Amino acid sequence: RDSFYNKHNLTPFLDSLMSHSLIFNNTYSNGLRSIEALPAITASIPTLSNTPFISSVYAQNKFNSLASILSEDGYSTSFFHGGTRGTMGFYSFCKKAGFQSYYGLEEYNDNKDYDGTWGIYDEPFFKFFAKKLKEEKKPFFSTFFSLSAHPPYSIPIKHKNKFKDGELDIHK
């Protein structure tokens, strides 16, 4: 396998890691939508019903997550998402899952980077994320949930017409 994105070499750094990594070619998705990803990835809770776990009555149950387990081992834990606190129930889930810190649009506090729909554009929010990680003083676990994979796929003006259009709306 030459790249993560089939015949297109769009992720050269990640591709360079493949020869030094354990790669799983056959995997199973534990959800179909973004709202289902956070519980699946951080707490091993797959989507088993038509209602995402975060929105279900089961979200009130006690459960362990990477954040809660690592917190017990002395790690600081944080979650970053450029949207508002109420978006997709992430803030409530993160508190219940044991994340010590939550950073979103309100914590970023600079509306000039707002995409007009979801929250802060990914590029400036990734820079904010990197700055916060550099401030960590002890072992840490952090999760970043980006906004760019959601319609209407807003692109900052400085990046318009910079890339060739692809086959899907997200590639335009």
Residues of each region from the PLM?
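Solvent-exposed soluble domains appended to multi-pass membrane proteins
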Residues: 1-172
